[in-house]
Amino acid sequence: MDPSRPHPLSGKLVVELAGLAPGPFCGMLLADYGASVLRIDGPRSPKGDVLARNKSSICIDLKHPPSRKVLLSILSRADVLIDPFRPGVLERLGLSPTEVLLKANARLVVARLTGFRRDGKYQDMAGHDINYLAVSGVLAMLGRAGENPFPPANILGDFAGGGAMCVVGILLALVSRDATGLGQVVEANMVDGSAYLATMPRLATKTPFWGSPRGENVLDGGCPWYATYRTKDPGGKYMAVGALEPHFYEVLVRGLGLDKTDLPPREDRANWPRLRALFEAKFAERTRSEWAEVFDGTDACVTPVLEQGELEKAGFEQRLPVNLGATPGKPILPGQGDWTGRTLAKGHGGEEILRRWIGWERGVDYHVEENSGILVACSREKL
């Protein structure tokens, strides 16, 4: 990577109001691609946020006017504000995006990220990833046949449908600003984000490909050649099989030591239980490493199911999700949150950000309360 080339978001100033996972993930994505991200912590901000790579922090009490003025001064120069709060919180704090923030800085992009829709029946309710997936229709697609729907950790709603989709909205607003010169309010929620990600399977439920109940379709665990299988290893290890196409399926069958002519036709779903039983018995005959050796370098679409601890011990390199040839993001270096789980201490690096962003100096423009670490404005000239 050429260090002389700028990162794609270099020069963009992002203010992230501290919150739970989706908002910090949104901020981390922007920081990884060069944005200067300042997290605003409060007296009761969440502790132990591991999604803090490449960020700085200051402490502000948004309910205390002299402290809130620090935030307003920062936002007068910022490009983006990430708001992770429930609907109406900013307004109650006197920080309405349309009536206050955009009037003070017309170029500001205010990204508001909620779990439920802001205009839906659940808008004022608490919730988590499982709830957002539930009302989006996505959760009902996940799980084994005859069993309860099963939540996929909090990856799909919080991070893919929430934080990542919010980044898309922010980038679109920044592109729009290049043409109009104006910022705007961006609204993202995990219900719509998750539902949008599920567009293909949702539409496919109207076709024979995905027309059966949950857990009885090709891609949802019902199909024996798109599933996981336990190996001979003590304690349980697994292989993942994704041999969808017929020519890949033939390679799978040969690798398992089976004769295709002895197997029932896979196109008939009535044969799926028998095929699954045959595959289960075969995979149980060898260890995961032995099966990996059999299928490595083939087009059987068979791979080992690796666990996080194994990847860490093997030195697996965490990389950014998208590589830009001319304007790359920041590489994730060892110790920068790849496997360490390090957190960002409240107030760390924030004073340097204030100096660079708005020219503020401690003791001249603000002071820091001794016990709480809260910043309070002490000069009105620059407010």
Curated annotation (Swiss-Prot):
Keywords: Antibiotic biosynthesis, Isomerase. It catalyses: isopenicillin N = penicillin N. Pathway: Antibiotic biosynthesis; cephalosporin C biosynthesis. The active site is at residue 158. Its EC number is 5.1.1.17, 5.1.99.-. The keyword Transmembrane helix does not apply. It comes from the Eukaryota. InterPro entries: CoA-transferase_III, CoA-Trfase_fam_III, CoA-Trfase_III_dom3_sf, CoA-Trfase_III_dom_1_sf. One of its GO terms (biological process) is penicillin biosynthetic process. Disulfide bonds: none annotated. One of its GO terms (molecular function) is isopenicillin-N epimerase activity. It is an enzyme of class 5 (isomerase). SUPFAM superfamilies: CoA-transferase family III (CaiB/BaiF). Belongs to the CoA-transferase III family. PANTHER family: ALPHA-METHYLACYL-COA RACEMASE (PTHR48228:SF5), SUCCINYL-COA--D-CITRAMALATE COA-TRANSFERASE (PTHR48228). Together with cefD1, catalyzes the reversible isomerization between isopenicillin N and penicillin N. This two-component IPN epimerase system may function by two sequential steps, an activation of isopenicillin N by the acyl-CoA synthase component cefD1, followed by epimerization by the acyl-CoA racemase component cefD2. This is Isopenicillin N epimerase component 2. The gene is cefD2.
